[in-house]
Curated annotation (Swiss-Prot):
Disordered: region residues: 1-30
Source species taxonomy: Eukaryota, Amoebozoa, Evosea, Eumycetozoa, Dictyostelia
InterPro entries in UniProt: SAP_dom, UPF0746_actin_org
The UniProt record lists the keyword Cell wall biogenesis/degradation: no
PANTHER family, per the entry: UPF0746 PROTEIN DDB_G0280785-RELATED
The organism of origin for this protein: Dictyostelium discoideum (Social amoeba)
GO terms, molecular function: DNA binding
PROSITE patterns xrefs: SAP (PS50800)
SAP domain location: 44-78
Protein name per UniProt: UPF0746 protein DDB_G0280785
């Protein structure tokens, strides 16, 4: 037996390159090992580990890892080959059939050839003709601003790109269709990110995945040659099935199976080898959809039967924030996934006794509920109802009659406990009067019973229905429901909060019952279960209801209780403190008016010079100002809570209305100004900063050290602010400031050199308008000329001068000055400054940081990067050679292949840049190690097309070339 295996292995080594892996063959055809022969003769347990390694190597597979891993790798290879052969055979048969049909058709006297484009609109053909013409393409895009943000430079589909661009799918589709050398998708990790991102089950997403599979398969003729060897779905079928299941993407998995016509046995094997059984144990709504789908096409291996929902979060299925249609689908997926009748029988056999009477009772209840739901027709559900949340439906439920629906077919919910469970939900024209709340309750009850029978029957203590289930479906008094909270939920603070808020906001509960609840809490009826220090939970529930009647009743009862208490014993806070503590919950003007008319003397936020106004929601500030102005009172603002989220917005409001606000800042405000700018940039509040700087003059220059640490993460958020800062700053004024640095460099020691410069931003009506236009495009807040340039009179308030600001100063480092100019598309100005002041800008202490990889990598485009490279080549010196090398490293890391192709096409540049410096070639700039590092960066970034281009062109030794190629093979 061993000798026979040895012969087979030798045959593999001699013949494995031949493509004859037909799974239906009875033996080894022409000496080749087939899937059946492999499974028959090479058992994972008895086969020698060394023999498996030889087979793996002969097939071009990795041979490292444990024995079972190597075995699974070989098995997966054969499964993929089977799918590929089936796909090829199908296409061959279709081509032969098509050829026969064409031969049978009468031949025209003169042949006419028509080029057709599948799935492409006629007008789109002209677009692609322009798009693929590099000369026209570059000419068009050279006229666009913000070239560094052009999508044609995007390399790789990472989370930043996929989540940061709302049209990321369209960009990928355009890039695939363009079929140019600059492909966004570079490797399998990019594909995995795509699978993790696009999961919606609609026609657009399904079409997207079909395009993806057609381009990245071994039969594709459109794919660039360099990518076809690294990404082929049909060469790695089992691994892609694993990735789609683990990323819980039903749409991709469904289209993948259909596109490549993968049979159930291949899917079963792939799941068994690569997907852990526990994946389906932690059951979610979306995982259930995949599980039921695989089950419906008979593709679930016996080892992966759905575990009994051990790690399932019941609250996710029963959330009242879910849409009604999701509740129906949850019910469907749960019931379809499990044969409850079979589970009952298995439990009886396992225990060798009849099932516990209580458990049997629950199974019977569930069966009864399923039968009841089978009788429900869904014609009374409108699209609005199906797309509404359960919470909203329960707050507006009335008996509903039959309503118009988009479908006219008739069927019912059909569910049984038999192995052939079936469920359909369509519409019927039958007239019906059914209470929607009762229907929702039946679905909830069924899901609860299902989980109890499947998971919690062995330990009833662990099972409890959500609190909202009792609050919405149990027809009990408020007192009775509160007892349930205490008995079933042990009276936790969170449950008390949920209970009080739900009761007080429920429009279906009578006001008298709510009044009774308030009275019972204040009279200590629940003192044993509701501690006094937890009263703030109840207070918050009352004020958050924003119900004037409830709040008024509550405050009057508090007042009565306080009158009955001695001065030394004050159980509850004062009325004024209560209202002030919860004023942030006020969400409508009527509540403010209510306090103003009835509790003005008690309310702290109606006092003169109060600071509590900062807690009132910004949407209500204008009405609040009107009330304060009507009684001649003012609010106070200092910088004590400068880090609050809306502080700068409130400061801008206060600056514009000095009759209502008094502002007082001492010298410490200069210290916190940087943090204020930083926090508002992170919160996308660039307009708030611009408003502030336009209406308040700092007595010291604004330091922009924040740019040093925060520029990279917040580049797009800062763009409007940067435009505002540099709008009226010319390159000549920057040159003047840099000349001062140059003088200091010549005459002072290094320690005395100040690497920062101070610039002045001039504010004019034109500046304001420009800023406003830009801001309007990028944010929802609009800024007008009027509110930027008022008030007219200046006023000193400590370290600030409030009033119309004509200009302000700021300091910025030379490095960040260059970065800002770059992001404003003022690269021509950078080149101008290079020429005028090379001794300053090319000073390693200043400029080297700008060209460091971590800085320029995040902002560079191929367009500008090539511009810098060409400039450094034309101005080579001891400093610029280092900057040139850094730019080449970035181009390699980002996969800008065209930059290197342009260098190679130039005989002079290629000799300087991409040939190794030796004794015989002193004209070259870089030694072997530096050039090797450039190639390694492209390999580590999985840009293999560029890697192979550089390996072939650079005159590395044979040893170095082999070493680099091995790095590529390991990452493929």
């Amino acid at each position: 037996m061993i000798s026979n295996k040895r012969k087979e292995i030798e045959n593999i080594n001699r013949h494995h390159e031949k493509d004859n892996d037909d799974d239906d063959s009875d033996g080894i055809d022409n000496g080749l090992l087939t899937y059946k022969k492999f499974k028959k003769d090479f058992d994972s347990g008895s086969t020698n580990y060394r023999e498996l390694q030889i087979i793996a190597k002969s097939l071009g597979l990795a041979s490292n890892g444990k024995k079972q891993l190597v075995y699974n790798r070989i098995e997966g290879y054969f499964l993929s080959k089977k799918v590929k052969n089936n796909l090829t055979n199908n296409e061959t048969n279709q081509q032969e059939e098509k050829k026969e049909e064409e031969q049978q058709q009468p031949q025209p006297q003169e042949k006419q050839y028509i080029l057709t484009f599948k799935d492409v609109e006629p007008v789109e053909i002209y677009f692609w003709k322009v798009f693929r013409n590099i000369v026209i393409f570059k000419h068009i895009f050279s006229n666009f601003k913000n070239k560094q943000y052009g999508y044609y430079d995007l390399i790789g589909c990472n989370g930043v790109f996929l989540n940061g661009k709302s049209n990321s799918m369209e960009i990928i589709i355009d890039n695939i269709k363009s079929n140019n050398n600059n492909q966004i998708i570079r490797n399998k990790y990019n594909i995995t990110n795509i699978i993790n991102k696009f999961k919606k089950n609609d026609e657009k997403t399904r079409s997207f995945y079909n395009l993806l599979f057609s381009r990245y398969s071994s039969t594709s003729t459109s794919l660039p040659i360099q990518l076809s060897s690294t990404i082929q779905f049909d060469e790695d079928i089992d691994k892609w099935i694993q990735r789609m299941i683990e990323n819980v993407n039903f749409t991709a998995l469904d289209q993948f199976i259909k596109f490549f016509k993968i049979d159930s046995e291949v899917i079963k094997k792939a799941i068994k080898i690569h997907v852990k059984p526990s994946v389906f144990g932690n059951t979610t709504y979306d995982k259930l959809k995949i599980y039921n789908y695989l089950k419906s096409i008979n593709s679930i291996p016996t080892s992966h039967k759905l575990l009994p929902f051990i790690s399932t979060d019941l609250s996710a299925f029963l959330s009242f924030d879910n849409k009604f249609k999701k509740l129906i689908k949850s019910y469907k997926r749960l019931i379809e996934s499990t044969n409850l009748q079979e589970r009952m029988e298995q439990q009886e056999q396992k225990e060798k006794i009849k099932i516990h009477p209580n458990n049997k009772k629950y199974y019977e209840k569930l069966n009864q509920k399923i039968l009841e739901l089978n009788e429900i027709q869904t014609s009374q559900f409108t699209n609005d109802q199906l797309n509404s949340t359960i919470k909203n439906l329960l707050n507006h439920t009335t008996p509903t009659s039959t309503s118009t629906s988009t479908s006219t077919s008739t069927s019912t919910l059909t569910l049984t406990l038999t192995p052939t469970t079936n469920l359909t939900i369509t519409t019927s024209t039958a007239s019906n009067n059914i209470n929607l709340k009762d229907i929702i309750k039946k679905f909830y009850k069924s899901i609860c019973l299902f989980f109890y029978c499947s998971v919690y029957s062995a330990n009833e203590r662990l099972f409890r229905k959500p609190l909202l289930y009792y609050l919405n479906f149990k027809k009990e008094s408020v007192d009775k429901m509160y007892e349930r909270v205490v008995n079933k939920w042990n009276g936790r603070s969170f449950d008390h909060q949920l209970f009080f808020q739900s009761i007080l906001k429920d429009i279906n509960i009578e006001k008298n019952e709510k009044f009774e609840l308030i009275l019972n809490v204040l009279d200590n009826k629940y003192v044993k279960t509701f501690e006094e220090y937890d009263h703030y939970i109840f207070f918050k529930a009352v004020f958050s209801s924003n119900d004037i009647e409830l709040i008024d009743y509550f405050l009057k009862k508090i007042k009565q209780l306080q009158l009955n208490q001695t001065q030394k014993i004050t159980k509850y806070p004062s009325i004024g403190k209560l209202i002030g503590d919860y004023c942030h919950l006020i969400d409508k003007k009527e509540i403010l008016d209510f306090y103003f008319q009835n509790y003005r003397d008690e309310c702290l936020f109606f006092k003169d010079q109060n600071e509590i106004w900062k807690q009132i929601q910004l949407e209500l500030i204008e009405h609040y100002e009107y009330l304060m102005d009507s009684i001649g009172k003012r609010c106070k603002l200092d910088f004590y809570r400068w880090f609050d989220q809306n502080f700068l917005d409130r400061l801008n409001i206060a600056i514009l209305k000095p009759s209502v606000y008094s502002i007082g800042f001492d010298g410490y405000f200069d210290i916190v100004s940087e943090g204020l700018v930083d926090s508002n940039i992170k919160d996308n509040k660039e307009n708030s900063i611009i408003n502030f700087l336009s209406n308040a003059q700092l007595k010291h220059p604004l330091s922009l050290e924040i740019f040093e640490s925060s520029f990279n993460p917040y580049t797009s958020k800062m763009l409007t602010f940067i435009k505002f800062l540099f709008n009226n700053i010319s390159k000549e004024s920057i040159e003047t400031k840099l000349k001062v640095i140059n003088l200091k460099t010549d005459n002072k020691s290094f320690e005395e050199i100040n690497s920062k410069i101070e610039l002045t931003t001039t504010l004019t009506a034109t500046t304001t308008t420009t800023t406003t236009t830009t801001t309007t495009k990028t944010t929802t807040t609009t800024t007008t000329t009027a509110n930027l340039l008022s008030p007219k009179k200046s006023k000193d308030v400590g370290c600030l001068t409030i009033g119309k600001t004509e200009s302000f100063n700021f300091t910025i480092s030379i490095r960040m000055l260059l970065v800002c100019l770059y992001n404003l598309d003022r690269v021509d100005d950078i080149i101008y400054l290079f020429d005028k002041l090379p001794e300053v800008l090319f000073n390693p202490d200043y400029f080297s940081i700008f060209t460091n990889e971590y800085c320029i990598y995040g902002i560079s485009s191929s367009y500008y990067l090539e511009l810098f490279i060409n400039y450094f080549i034309a101005n080579i010196n001891d400093n610029t050679i280092n900057y040139l090398y850094n730019c080449l490293c970035i181009a390699s890391k980002k996969g800008y292949t065209q930059i290197f192709k342009n260098i190679i096409s130039s005989d002079q540049n290629s000799k300087y840049l991409l040939k190794i410096q030796t004794k015989s070639n002193q004209s070259s700039l870089f030694n072997s190690k530096l050039l090797n590092d450039i190639v390694v960066k492209s390999i580590n970034s999985l840009n293999f097309e560029l890697s192979n281009l550089l390996i072939d062109f650079i005159d590395f030794s044979a040893k170095d070339k082999n070493s680099l190629k091995m790095k590529i093979l390991k990452l493929k």
